[in-house]
Amino acid sequence: MVPPVQVSPLIKLGRYSALFLGVAYGATRYNYLKPRAEEERRIAAEEKKKQDELKRIARELAEDDSILK
């Protein structure tokens, strides 16, 4: 087994700094995007509800207008 390699403290500091900055950036980006995504999901749900209602009405009209009464 190969012994562990000594890594410069400056390189370690750089790696951990980059890791911390990446985590901080991800957290702020998530907090920025989360409300926008919730709004998009709410709008999509409302549109789906409207489309379902229109389909239901069209289906009822198609059943009422059937030739085979």
From Swiss-Prot:
One of its GO terms (molecular function) is proton transmembrane transporter activity. The modification N6-acetyllysine is found at residue 34. The keyword Acetylation applies. One of its GO terms (biological process) is proton motive force-driven mitochondrial ATP synthesis. Pfam families: ATP-synt_E. InterPro entries: ATP_synth_F0_esu_mt. Keywords: Acetylation, ATP synthesis, CF(0), Hydrogen ion transport, Ion transport, Membrane, Mitochondrion, Mitochondrion inner membrane, Phosphoprotein, Transport. It comes from the Eukaryota. PANTHER family: ATP SYNTHASE E CHAIN, MITOCHONDRIAL, ATP SYNTHASE SUBUNIT E, MITOCHONDRIAL. Component of the ATP synthase complex composed at least of ATP5F1A/subunit alpha, ATP5F1B/subunit beta, ATP5MC1/subunit c (homooctomer), MT-ATP6/subunit a, MT-ATP8/subunit 8, ATP5ME/subunit e, ATP5MF/subunit f, ATP5MG/subunit g, ATP5MK/subunit k, ATP5MJ/subunit j, ATP5F1C/subunit gamma, ATP5F1D/subunit delta, ATP5F1E/subunit epsilon, ATP5PF/subunit F6, ATP5PB/subunit b, ATP5PD/subunit d, ATP5PO/subunit OSCP. Belongs to the ATPase e subunit family. Subunit e, of the mitochondrial membrane ATP synthase complex (F(1)F(0) ATP synthase or Complex V) that produces ATP from ADP in the presence of a proton gradient across the membrane which is generated by electron transport complexes of the respiratory chain. ATP synthase complex consist of a soluble F(1) head domain - the catalytic core - and a membrane F(1) domain - the membrane proton channel. These two domains are linked by a central stalk rotating inside the F(1) region and a stationary peripheral stalk. This is ATP synthase F(0) complex subunit e, mitochondrial. It comes from Homo sapiens (Human).
